[in-house]
Amino acid sequence: AVRLLQQHGENARLIAGGTHLLVLMKMEREAPRALISVNKIPGLDVITVHADGSLIIGSRVSIRDLGRHPLVRSRYTGLAQACESFGSTQIEIMGTVGGNVCNGSPAADLVPMLLVFNAEVLLKGPPGERSVPLEQFLVRPGVTAIRPDEVMVGVSLPPVAVGSSATAPDT
C-alpha cells in the first residue's frame, strides 16, 4: 500500500470500509484516480492485547468488532459505548477504526473516547513506522498529520488501571 501511495501520489486514496470516502465520491467532493484497498493486508483487522493490558487496534478493525471485544467492554467501557452509538448496523459492520480516525471529522464517534484513553496513531511509510499522539494527529477539521505516502496501521491504547473507568455521554 505504501508503494502504491508513492506511485500514485495525491491522486490515490486508501479504502477499507468506504463508508465516508464513497459518500464523498458520490457527492463529487472526492475524485481519486486510484483506490488502494487495504482489505488484504494481514494484521490490520486484529486487536492485540499485550501482557500489561495495553491494546493495539488494527486500522481495519470494524466498529462492531471493536465494541464487542471483551477487554474493550470491560476496561475501555466508554469506547465500547461509542461503538454502539453509530447510526446504523451497516456502518458498524463496514466502518473501520482507521476510517473514523483518518477522515479527521469533528463528528467522528470514536475520537473523543480515544482521546480520553490517550490513544496514539500508528503509521507506516517509506522511512518506517511512527507513533503520533491522537491530539497531535488531528490538525484541524478534515486535516490530519498523516503524510501522503503513509498508511495508518492502527491505534495504540495504554493499559487502563483496574477500577478506573470512563463512559461516553448519552447522545
Question: What are the roles of these predicted feature ranges?
Answer:
Residues V2-T171:
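C-terminal structural segment of proteins
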